[in-house]
């Protein structure tokens, strides 16, 4: 890991079907945040489509093909990956949780206050790539 990787947070994982809440800093997005009370942290969940198992498998393939992604945990419909930046090695913690027709997501920077929209852009890029894979 790079110089600015930080420590892995202790609040990762799903508890009673819920991922950890975002802190007040703007460097986190989550599909389980209330979109009306906290729109700056809210991002829509990924669509699991008509076959959630196929979508989950596609998500895992997509992550495996992405540079600087380390899948740390993949069990029982929960996946946790670390994404690192190429230059300074900043690490973001990204979680995916299967929930029927949705895949809930949480993406948060370990260090700093602002992420300049990187976490939101990452989830939207994954959403776009999954949709493209599903249409093939």
Predicted regions and their residues:
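Ser/Thr-rich, low-complexity intrinsically disordered terminal regions
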Residues: 2-136
């Amino acid at each position: 890991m790079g110089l600015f990787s930080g420590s892995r947070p202790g609040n990762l994982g799903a508890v009673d079907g819920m991922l950890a809440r975002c802190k007040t800093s703007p460097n986190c997005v989550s599909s389980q945040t209330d979109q009306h009370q906290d729109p700056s942290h809210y991002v829509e969940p990924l669509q699991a489509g008509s076959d959630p198992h196929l979508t989950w498998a596609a998500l895992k393939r997509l992550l495996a093909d992405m540079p600087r992604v380390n899948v740390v945990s993949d069990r029982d419909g929960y996946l946790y990956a670390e994404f690192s930046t190429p230059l300074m090695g900043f690490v973001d913690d990204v979680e995916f949780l299967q929930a029927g027709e949705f895949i809930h997501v949480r993406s948060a920077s370990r260090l700093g206050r602002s992420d300049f929209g990187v976490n939101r852009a990452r989830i939207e890029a994954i959403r776009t790539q999954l949709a493209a894979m599903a249409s093939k």
